[in-house]
Amino acid sequence: MKTTRLWIRDPLAILAQDSGGGLVIDGTRIVERVAAGASPAAPVDGTFDASRHVVLPGLINTHHHFFQTLTRAHPVAINKPLFAWLQALYPVWEKLTPEAFRLATRVAYVELLLSGCTTAGDHHYLYPKGLEHAIDIQVEEARSLGIRAFITRG
């Protein structure tokens, strides 16, 4: 399958050394850093004028609890301090189904991707009956969305 080589040309600012001329992307991978005033070493299929754009690296979220995306505004826990909040939500979380957990995981990954995060770490500590394979669900969702992930069991 042929991929498209795109030159992100002459960005206003870029946080990659020796890349003032931009980056060449082949499919989903950065394949070349282009020095200021230079052109890519190999032909490209398209060019994006980035002269009014800032090119940032993918962000990394190192601490998340994906399952909590479903209860972030749950009425039983709004405006409570941490331990009261946890006590209010544990009974809700213990009823979490694999389907709801998959949805929570997908929502978390998509929100992170939309905000520029390309790597996410989840500290998963919730294993009610029926969610013994929660980490498998998280890995499947990460693969389906193309986000890098590291999952820890708490």
Description of each model-found segment:
Residues 1-42, 53-55:
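N-terminal metal-binding scaffold of metallo-dependent hydrolase/deaminase domains
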Residues 17, 68-72, 129:
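Active-site-proximal flexible loops/turns
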Residues 52, 149-153:
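A structural signal for short, well-ordered beta-strand segments
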Residues 65, 125-126, 152-154:
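Active-site beta-loop-alpha junctions enriched in small/polar residues
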